[in-house]
C-alpha cells in the first residue's frame, strides 16, 4: 500500500525496508524519490548484487551484524546426493528429541515423491502440506497447526522462506536443492536453529552426474559458511 500514489504521510521521518532483496528497484526508487528527506534503513541477510555493490563503493553506508542472538548454536549443514537411509536418519533423529521438521521442495509437483518416500520407509510421523496454490486461509491453518505442535512435519515449497519462527523445528530437509538459488537456500536454512538447540539442514540433490559443477559448488558454499555470523 505504500507504493500507491494516493497515500500521503504528513511527517514521515524513517523508513525501514526488511527483506530488502524482495523489493524491486523501481519500488525502492519510488519511495526514495517521493520522500527524499527520510532516513532509509534496508535490512537483508542476502542483499541483491546492486545493493551490495553500491555499499562496497561507498554510495550507501553499510553495517554488518555479526553477533548472533544469545544461546544460538551453529546449524550443521550437509550436502549430499539423496539416499533413503539419510532421509530416514534425519527424521528419526529429530523425532527422537521431540522436535519438528521442515521438508522443502522446489516445485509443487515434487510433493507426491516426498509422501511416497515417507510411506515406503514406514515413517510414523504426522504431517501437513503447504504451497502457494492453496487458499490463504488453508495455508494459515496448516502453519498454525505446525506452530502449535499438532503435527511433526511440514512439507512445503519455499513459501516458508521468511516470516516463520518455530523454535521447536530444528531439522530442515530440502529435496532437489540444486534447483534453488543460493539466497533462497540461505533464507530457508534460517528457518531452523532459532533456539538453543542444535539444528540440522540436509541439502539433498540429484546424482552428481545429473547436475553441473556450478550447481554443486553453490551448495558446497552454503555448507562451508555454517558458523554463526558467517556470510558470503
What residues fall within each predicted segment?
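C-terminal helicase module of SF1/SF2 nucleic-acid helicases/translocases
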Residues: 84-232
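A short beta-strand-to-loop transition that corresponds to the Sensor-1 phosphate-sensing loop
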Residues: 1-2, 20, 43-48, 56-59, ...
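Post-DEXD/H (motif II) to motif III coupling segment of the RecA-like Helicase ATP-binding lobe
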Residues: 8-96
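Conserved helix/coil segment N-terminal to the catalytic DExD/H
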Residues: 1-14, 25, 137-145, 162
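Homeobox/homeodomain signature
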Residues: 2, 13, 38, 42-47, ...
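Short amphipathic alpha-helical segments
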Residues: 7-11, 27-30, 53-56, 114-117, ...
Amino acid at each position: 500500500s505504500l507504493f500507491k500514489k494516493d497515500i500521503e504521510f504528513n511527517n514521515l521521518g524513517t523508513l525501514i525496508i526488511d527483506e530488502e532483496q524482495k523489493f524491486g528497484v523501481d519500488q525502492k526508487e519510488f519511495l526514495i524519490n517521493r520522500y527524499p528527506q527520510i532516513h532509509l534503513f534496508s535490512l537483508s541477510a542476502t542483499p541483491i548484487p546492486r545493493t551490495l555493490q553500491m555499499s562496497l563503493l561507498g554510495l550507501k553506508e553499510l553495517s554488518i551484524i555479526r553477533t548472533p542472538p544469545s544461546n544460538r548454536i551453529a546449524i550443521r549443514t550437509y550436502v549430499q546426493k539423496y539416499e533413503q537411509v539419510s532421509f530416514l536418519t534425519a527424521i528419526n533423529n529429530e523425532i527422537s528429541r521431540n522436535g519438528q521438521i521442515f521438508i522443502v521442495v522446489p516445485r509443487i509437483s515434487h510433493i507426491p515423491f516426498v509422501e511416497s518416500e515417507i510411506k515406503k520407509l514406514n515413517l510414523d510421523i504426522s504431517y501437513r502440506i503447504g504451497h502457494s496454490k492453496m487458499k490463504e486461509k488453508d495455508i494459515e491453518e496448516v502453519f498454525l497447526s505446525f506452530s502449535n505442535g499438532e503435527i511433526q512435519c511440514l512439507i512445503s515449497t519455499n513459501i516458508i522462506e521468511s516470516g516463520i519462527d518455530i523454535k521447536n523445528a530444528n531439522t530442515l530437509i530440502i529435496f532437489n536443492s540444486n534447483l534453488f538459488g543460493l539466497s533462497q537456500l540461505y533464507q530457508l536454512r534460517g528457518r531452523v536453529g532459532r533456539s538453543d538447540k542444535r539444528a540440522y539442514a540436509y541439502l539433498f540433490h540429484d546424482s552428481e552426474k545429473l547436475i553441473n559443477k556450478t550447481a554443486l559448488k553453490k551448495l558446497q558454499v552454503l555448507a562451508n559458511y555454517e558458523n554463526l555470523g558467517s556470510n558470503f
